[in-house]
């Protein structure tokens, strides 16, 4: 996403192409990319917890188990994972690390969360289902040896209690790097809902601070789709130095081809085409995140 200077019109989420009528819809591509990336983060954390807890714990007490500390020959950090049962079917966990060459250094928590397991009809826990929250702290990780380029924090909540249940994922990213502008730190909010066999939605808000060449602004995207794949995105953009709200709406069919697009502030026919009556959702709906 980028914020143009005062001579430009809008804050935009960038995609690789500018869709034309009949081509793959630009805002479908944005919706898919954002949802796959953010949802993938939640799935990756869940998979990591399950992977580690599949191994025998190093130590076990009545309500907690500890894996580690363990070291790898090429990893300068030694890691420890603690899982604590806080209530029936409810667990808290934390991933901690420290410099493996400093055995008296305190452990630093880089990932922590809580999880309530989904239960089947017999009251037994189902792997891969549940509700909870977690925080991934890249700033904390940066205090340990060999940090990566990530900074800031990600706070997730999720709910998928069983097969056939609604999936909800929310995320807040605070002071993370913008891939397009590595020197910028930005905030973003995200919400995803998928009803089983039915409609789904994604909301994404991106806040960009001002700098020497940009006044900054806020972009909001709300996308909705049918189970067939046909959908619609409605976008609003407010740049700090512009007195107007910039809007974009685009619809796509079940083949993800763009069928309708409107950009009220543009007179370019490439930005305005098709009939809104063909949309899976006939009226715009803007994000309220």
Segments from the language model and where they lie:
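Hydrophilic extracytoplasmic domains
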Residues: 223-289
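Short N-terminal edge-element motif at the start of the domain
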Residues: 47-146
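Short helix-loop boundary/capping segments
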Residues: 108-226
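Polar low-complexity intrinsically disordered regions enriched in Ser/Thr and small residues
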Residues: 71, 75, 116, 200-203, ...
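A residue-identity detector for tryptophan
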Residues: 27, 67-70, 79, 138, ...
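N-terminal "mature head" segments of proteins
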Residues: 1-89, 259-289
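Acidic, low-complexity intrinsically disordered regions
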Residues: 23, 63, 75, 134, ...
